[in-house]
Amino acid sequence: MKTIRIVVMSLVTAILVGCGTTSTVPITGRKQTLLVSDGEVLSLSTQQYKQYMQSAKASTNATNTAMVKRVGQNLANAVSTYLTNNGLSAELQNYQWEFNLVQDNQVNAWCMPGGKIVVYEGILPITKDEASLAIVLGHEIAHAVAKHSAERLSNEYKNQYGTAILGAVVQGAGVSEKTQALISLGQQLGGALWTSGFSRKQESEADHMGLIFAAMAGYDPQVAVSFWQRMSQLSGNKPAEFLSDHPSDATRIRQIQGWMPEALKYYKPAKSATMTTTGKTLKISSKKTSTKKKTTTKKK
């Protein structure tokens, strides 16, 4: 019976893989098999992103909000340039970048497929400056570019619905079964499908790619080591949400140091007047700012 089950599951896997597509992760070159299309993933994630943003409270700190959007856009521009220069411009249609800062004391940030990024105010005292924030955002952007959510959904889909899909294939069922299965699986996993639960391999890959993206955008990648050291000191005996599925602190820092020579090849501090913020270390604002202008009276 056990042998029969192994044979059946092997057949299921073969059929599912045959129905999927093989893609290459940018920068790392890792091969991955995806059983779901970009359209299917975006359809599921967009709905859950809208639901989250309807209940979330946007930050009232105008300075920090502007910083998150500025750093995020610099990174998005760097990613777009990289993809275009490497013959991957078709991928750009999958990203409509949005960068949000929300009122939440958790030390966390996440990115949904399609480039919907949320940063919690609680992580800013740890990032301390724009360069470290770029490391965080680069990591989250990397999850989207590497299609980690689609990869995870493919694995969950294969594990939970393999036998059912095999039956559907044998009976000549249409595509609707797959669509219904995806919707059901997405509902079961909820927002966690897009914002947590990545494998250690995926987290390390996001560290690697994020480091490169930050350097491409003009941020010093060397700040990554001190940032992750601060994160490890913060967690103590209770890992922060942001670190719950990540490699150990020692492993992460060792890996980052190993990737540093590669990252530094891409690093060119911004020199133009229009991008002076990307190469500098700017402190995080701890005060709520107002958009109202102050009026001054000149002394006669």
Which functions belong to the PLM regions below?
Residues 9:
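Internal catalytic-core helix/loop-beta-alpha segment
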Residues 2-6, 19-300:
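A Zn2+-metalloprotease active-site environment signal
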Residues 14-18:
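C-terminal motif of bacterial Sec signal peptides marking the signal peptidase cleavage site
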